Amino acid sequence: MSLQEDIITQLGVKPKIDAQEEIRKSIDFLKAYMKKHGFLKSYVLGISGGQDSSLAGRLAQLAIEELRHETGDNGYKFIAIRLPYGVQADEDDAQRALNFIQPDVSLAINIKPAVDGEVAALAEAGVQVSDFNKGNIKARQRMISQYAVAGENGGAVIGTDHAAENITGFFTKFGDGGADILPLYRLNKRQGKQLLAELGADKALYEKIPTADLEENKPGIADEVALGVTYNDIDDYLEGKQVSPAAQKIIENWWNKTEHKRHLPISIFDDFWK
């Protein structure tokens, strides 16, 4: 088995999908997990205004609505959280996403005071935080906020990780990579677009250039620029298609370099890293 075939198998990516079938699969998955755990009453997700949180958010809201209808329990709810660092440049997109998702509850938490306070505390201790590292602090602070809200609402935190993100390790460890449940896992980037189109989302939500937008020295830097490879190449690779040798090398280098992100903390019994 080639490395490409092994990766595809591990991530469960199909070369072609039926959008309606995958929507139903994700909704049923979210419902089943909540019903299995009687202490859960809510799902929580941070909404950025990008493709992934728009899709995961809408799927979560639909799952919760079906749960309420099927069980007669109106205590189930979906909580969407805006988590800007100060004023978000693409706030209009975030509001467009919320309008599409129609969450039961919508909160806004400005993470800037917490992030800046942490950076200042580190500086007092003699640790100067780089812009890149500060970006990771932002991602982790967002997850702290989501888990705090979940903890007060009998909630589980939804993650937006999908195959195109997983293969490259393009997420912050214990930041946006920290979550309880991943309804998009198995889908690549273009397949996520298919689901959003099927759900009737505004094209602006899935045609905008993807960006993590964590670094202040590189505001709005496109994912594809940061990765050095296009999502089209990543998606083709995940669908078992041939890509250029250069693209294949970059993708497989990301996979190997970020393997630690796809594991729980390493114990003495783990050997994947050797």
Swiss-Prot record:
A single GO BP term for this record reads: NAD biosynthetic process
Which Gene3D superfamilies has this protein been placed in?
HUPs
One Pfam family this sequence matches: NAD_synthase
Q: In which pathway does it act?
A: Cofactor biosynthesis; NAD(+) biosynthesis; NAD(+) from deamido-NAD(+) (ammonia route): step 1/1
| Record: residues binding Mg(2+) | D52, E165
* Residues that, per the record, bind ATP: G46, I47, S48, G49, G50, Q51, D52, S53, T160, K189, T211
Q: State how it assembles.
A: Homodimer.
**PANTHER family from the xrefs?**
NH 3 /GLUTAMINE-DEPENDENT NAD + SYNTHETASE, NH(3)-DEPENDENT NAD(+) SYNTHETASE
Q: What is this protein called?
A: NH(3)-dependent NAD(+) synthetase
> Which species does this protein come from?
Streptococcus mutans serotype c (strain ATCC 700610 / UA159)
